[in-house]
């Protein structure tokens, strides 16, 4: 990540370009991985990257209603896995990029003065280089010289959310890895 980062987007070390899906696909291809889009099944004897099940966007969009859609999303994930197994894939590793919080009564409101941060997200904020914050401050994974102020507990710096992520609760940080093997 860049020193003056204010958008939580990592940068490629070699070019300083913002990392994007374009670079993900390019780097996967350089390493011999396939990027499978939609219902593509690719070459089962190789390696592939598949994205499916969009709980994150659904949560941000639906907020309070999000739980109504979880079963359908999981059914879609199962269907995608079955399609890959039926196409001949022997092993599938299922991971997620982060967990999330859903609170029926809404996340409580946390406070951070606007003058301290360059980007105030729901559950964390990028601090200005000279800012002092009384709460928990952690280094950004992509650039440890960038400081991130964490909202306390399950609160958010922006009010009105029932669903969100970006904090340090167990639900947001625990990302299980599931390994599926074709029994045939």
Question: What does each model-found stretch correspond to?
Answer:
Residues 1-184:
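Feature captures the catalytic ectodomains and active-site-proximal regions of enzymes
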């Amino acid at each position: 990540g860049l020193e003056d980062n204010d958008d939580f987007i990592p940068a490629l070390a070699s070019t300083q370009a913002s990392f994007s899906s374009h670079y993900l696909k390019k780097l996967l291809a350089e390493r011999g991985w396939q990027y499978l889009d939609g219902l593509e099944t690719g070459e089962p004897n190789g390696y592939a990257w598949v994205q499916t099940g969009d709980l994150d966007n659904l949560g941000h969009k639906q907020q309070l209603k999000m739980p109504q859609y979880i079963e359908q999303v999981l059914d879609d994930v199962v269907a995608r896995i079955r399609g890959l197994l039926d196409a001949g894939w022997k092993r599938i590793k299922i991971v997620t990029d982060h967990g999330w919080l859903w609170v029926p009564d809404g996340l409580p409101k946390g406070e951070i003065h606007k003058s301290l941060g360059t980007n105030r997200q729901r559950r964390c904020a990028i601090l200005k280089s000279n800012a002092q914050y009384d709460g928990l401050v952690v280094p950004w994974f992509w650039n440890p010289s960038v400081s991130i102020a964490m909202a306390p507990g399950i609160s958010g710096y922006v009010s009105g959310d029932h669903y969100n992520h970006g904090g340090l609760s167990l639900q947001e940080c625990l990302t299980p890895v599931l390994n599926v093997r074709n029994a045939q």
